[in-house]
UniProtKB/Swiss-Prot annotation:
Keywords: Cytoplasm, Endosome, Hydrolase, Repeat, WD repeat. It is found in: Cytoplasm; Endosome. This is Diphthine methyltransferase. It comes from the Eukaryota. Transmembrane segments: none annotated. It comes from Saccharomyces cerevisiae (strain ATCC 204508 / S288c).
Length: 387
């Protein structure tokens, strides 16, 4: 990487609370989830902050539980899900004009549902919208569990507005959490039958055949697992591939590695990004535990490989050279843009990176059409940069 010039920072700002995750909405605003620990009480709280693309704070929505992850629905990007340290997820609605040329000060964000999935001392580590089923949501937690829920809607059409109406009609109960009383909706989740032995940090829906009914999970037990989405039964696991916890997974999608439908990308605390060929998993085969992969490739990124975000479709079209690109948040080693190319001697190649301004754990990042936004935790750093 010595020959690669570090990318230039466009804008930088210090957030009020430590930023843990972020997403960019329609190339117009940056949504940031924050996580703060009160050491005197042990209570964790956070906020959903909204920034312009030049990092001016538009508004901040305080949450009684810290935010560990946030995602936008691929079916209606005005629907946000946030994962919290208090066993709950929250659904939010962005209200703005339907046109992409809206001004950032013309939008409004408000919570539409507070769903209690687990006990209040369980942290929800990640949340994921299904790429195939608009109502399906996947979560993981620090008790080692992964589960799905079905999002309620009163309309045939899946919209944030219809979801808000559906949850507004449900009874809320008083719930004692962190010394306060909050209004929540208790939701029964469909848990996968085989949990991880330690924290389940991440998960991913399969997208392409034959994995369209498979969910992959990664845990602090160094184990990568596959589960049947329909029956919730265990399919396959391996704890001999990674030398530390598995914290990020990326499956092939129509716009990402679509020529490798049986391959997944993983990231671990052991600093390595890996490509795993899982062709040994047939459509009706349950291989069991520690069955080796057909093939694996690895690259040391010099920091824990915490999060993957694939390049936007329009950027991939302009970048088109037979390779796929990921933004990788590398914890204590900043963020990197990594390409994957079958036509190269080295499958993984670092194309761009940013370390300056991220003197702490880089946990969150996303792309817009023109820039990348990343955040790091203990130094409260939010930055934008170009590649």
């Amino acid at each position: 990487m010595d020959s690669i010039q570090e990318s230039d920072v466009l804008n930088a700002v210090k957030t009020k609370l430590p930023p843990c995750c972020l997403r960019i909405f329609r190339n117009k605003i940056i949504l940031v989830g924050t996580y703060d620990l009160d050491k005197s009480t042990g209570y964790r709280s956070g906020s959903l902050d909204v920034f312009t693309m030049d990092l001016k704070l538009l508004c901040s929505n305080n949450t009684y539980g810290a935010i560990l992850d946030l995602k936008l629905s691929p079916f209606d990007d005005t629907l946000i899900c946030t994962a919290h340290s208090t066993g709950n997820i929250m659904l939010w609605r962005i209200r703005c004009t339907d046109k992409d040329d809206f001004q950032s000060n013309e939008l409004d964000i408000h919570a539409i549902a507070n769903l209690q999935l687990f006990e209040k001392d369980v942290l929800i580590a990640s949340c994921h919208f299904s790429p195939l089923d608009c109502k399906k949501l996947l979560v993981t937690n620090t008790a080692g569990e992964a589960a799905t829920i079905d999002i309620r809607t009163l309309s045939v059409q899946f919209t944030a507005s219809a979801i808000a109406q559906a949850y507004s009609k449900l009874d809320k109960i008083d719930y004692e959490v962190q010394g306060a009383t909050e209004k929540v909706i208790h939701v029964e989740s469909g848990q996968f039958l085989k949990p991880h032995e330690l924290e389940c940090w991440t998960a991913e829906f399969g997208s392409l055949q034959p994995f369209q009914d498979v969910v992959f999970t990664g845990g602090d037990d160094s184990r990568i697992m596959a589960h049947d989405l329909r029956s919730k039964e265990f399919i396959w696991s391996n704890n001999r591939i990674h030398d530390a916890g598995v914290v990020s997974i990326k499956c092939s999608q129509p716009n990402f590695r679509n020529n490798k439908p049986t391959s997944i990308i993983t990231g671990s605390y052991d600093d390595n990004i890996r490509s795993l060929d899982l062709r040994m998993m047939g459509e009706s085969i349950f291989p069991g535990a520690n069955v080796p992969t057909v093939n694996k490739l690895a690259c040391d990124l010099g920091g824990g490989v915490w999060r993957f975000v694939e390049s936007p479709i329009d950027q991939e079209q302009s970048h088109h050279n037979g390779s796929d690109r990921l933004l990788v948040c590398c914890m204590y080693n900043g963020a990197k843009v990594v390409t994957m190319n079958d036509n190269s001697d080295e499958y993984f190649q670092i194309q761009h990176y940013l370390k300056k301004g991220h003197d702490s754990m880089c946990y969150g990042g996303d792309w817009s059409n023109s820039l990348i936004a990343t955040c790091s935790f203990y130094d409260n750093s939010l930055q934008t940069w170009i590649v």
